Amino acid sequence: VVQAWGDPLNQDISEFPRNAHGLFVDHNDFVWVGSYRHHRVMKFTRNGELVMTLGMYNVNEGSNHPELLGGPSGVWVDPDTNEVFISDGYRNRRVIVYDGDTGAYLRHWGAYGNPPDDDYDFGARDSNDPPPPQFSTVHGLTGSHDGLIYVADRRGNRIQVFQQSGDFVTEKI
């Protein structure tokens, strides 16, 4: 069933996401919407009631801040643990995980399962260069039935695979 809710012309921006990027309907029928330009992920009921906001409107303090997002691009919720995995990659360079009920920060990681480094300089890269040690543009993610998290690093031209703990498994270029 297709539904519509919200009014982007008349509703306050704190209640309705602009620049949506990443949409996921979880196992409890909550609708998660990423707003990459305004650094938030918003959790709605199927009727459009806002029940949780992760991140803060227009506030980003880098890839290692536990409560703020920086350009979220994708959302996936594990139906077994209710953990919310977010690809936070337009301003930040990481995957970040929250509790889906409370919104509490749980963990985050960068490329290869290492801490993200916002100061890394990608410089001029071409297709013959080895993969960078940091994520470039974490553009999306998904979990799968094998218990792994698949992360698309668009500008890094790769997909990295992780355990849900953040431990690196493999990379496909």
Name every feature range the model reports, one short phrase each:
Residues 45-49, 99-102, 163-167:
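Short loop/turn segments that connect beta-strands within beta-propeller blades
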Residues 2-7, 51-58, 105-123, 169-173:
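Beta-propeller fold detector
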Residues 154-173:
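A beta-strand-loop signature enriched in Asp, Gly, Thr, and Trp
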Residues 33-36, 78, 86-89, 151-154:
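Conserved beta-strand positions in repeat-built beta-propeller and related beta-rich domains
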Residues 39-42, 51, 92-95, 157-159:
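Structural signal for beta-propeller blades
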Residues 10-30, 59-81, 117-148:
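Beta-rich, blade/repeat-based domains predominating
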Residues 70-98:
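Aromatic- and glycine-enriched pocket-lining scaffold segments that form the walls
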Residues 28, 38, 81, 90-92, ...:
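Surface-exposed loop/turn positions within WD40 beta-propeller blades
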